[in-house]
Amino acid sequence: MAKFKCKVCGYVHEGDKAPEKCPVCQAPASEFEDIVEGGDAAPKKKGLDTNSNTYTIVYAAIMVVIVAFLLAFVSSSLKDKQDANVKLDYKKQILNSLDLRGLSNEEAETKYSEVVKDEKEVEEGYKIFTCDLNGETKYIFTVKGMGLWGPISGFIALNADKQTIYGVYFNHEGETAGLGAEIKDSKAWQDNFKGKKLYKGDDKSAIVLGVKKKVEIPESEVDAVTGATLTSDGVDLMLKDGLAKYNDFLKQ
């Protein structure tokens, strides 16, 4: 015959099961525990303590591993598409400098293949693209620099004379919206570069194309973006330093 002990008052009951109520303190059957031989209450079977620190740490670690695995899987699955999108965006920026804007993805791929005939890297990050635009040769040069809040870059398209600007396109990663962002978002401002000259006359000792708050050489300089002096200064320096890397080619 089994023995059951009331955890409230200590009353011991003998029988097949615990009484519905303790006759001494009226505690319910749930307050009784088995007594094993020797008089001690049967130890409770230990389960998983979901309130313990160990459980919390282990659970969190498992979730971190699962989430990391899922993110890695998704990233790996999308990598090819992401790389393709980056390359396509780069091609569109090149076409923008030729004033071929607003093209769909398919149109951009087709037009790029038609127009760009050769690509040459003179230094890491600095490339020359030789293009055939409606039977006319154009050269596109990549440049890069720093704006107020982050990196800026550009594509400078020249006519076959390697002196006259055909078109430009600038990009940025984080310039002030409405001010510094004008270098990318304002086609009207970019159009100011059309027809400008890299050099002052026949003197090819230095690039004079630039962006100035007060224009002194109208044949080669463009008005700075109002309210974005530091960004404009960054573009000016980028043009002079960046295009100087192509001096050997430009002087040919």
Each model region followed by its residue ranges:
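Short, non-ligating residues that shape and space the ligands of small metal-coordination modules
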Residues: 15-16, 29-34
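Residues immediately within or flanking Cys/His clusters that coordinate Zn2+
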Residues: 3, 19
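Flexible, solvent-exposed loop/hinge segments and secondary-structure transition points
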Residues: 43-252
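Cys/His/Pro-rich metal-binding microdomains
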Residues: 7, 23
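Cys/His-coordinated zinc-binding microdomains
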Residues: 10, 26
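A generic "binding-loop/recognition-motif" signal
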Residues: 18, 28, 175
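Catalytic cores of transferase enzymes with a strong primary signal for eukaryotic protein kinases
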Residues: 2, 14
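Intrinsically disordered, low-complexity Ser/Thr-rich linker and spacer segments
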Residues: 34-45
